[in-house]
Amino acid sequence: MRTARAGRPALRLVAPHESDAPAPLVSFCSHCGTRPAPGALPNGSRVCGSCCLGLILESRADVAPDADDAFLVLDRSLAVCAVSRAAEQLLDTSEPDAVNRHITELLMPAGAEETGGENLSAAVVWAARGDGAVRTAVVRPANTFGIRLTARIASCGPSPAALLVLD
């Protein structure tokens, strides 16, 4: 163990294991969650060929939503950029009504007394900055009590944004 000048133990940065390879990136639609087959999109197109409503985004395969999963895409100011079809139903909103609203108008941390887990706002900001970590938070719809959802929060792109998948 390293020691500081005064003989006390010192902290040091521990590097991740070299064998921990990051999960591969996959594409998905920001509205329906469908994952297009590689090469299925016309050259330069970013619009989903399945629903024709969402843009194609990328995220880690272990976090990216599956078709019909409930998820939101947020920017670093905690504003909603996209809402999936399943999240519209779950949160009782429509995408045009939800876009550009603050995340706390749709989702809240599930309990103020909980000390474990990540702070929802901090997790979203880190993901929207392009941080490679996957975080989780327990949330509830802002207009409903008694419902708890686990949210997986990670970065997505092409430009850094936060992907919040509700399980």
Predicted regions and their residues:
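Sensory/regulatory domains in signal-transduction proteins
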Residues: 2-40, 44-47, 52-54, 68-70, ...
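PAS-family sensory domains
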Residues: 61-64
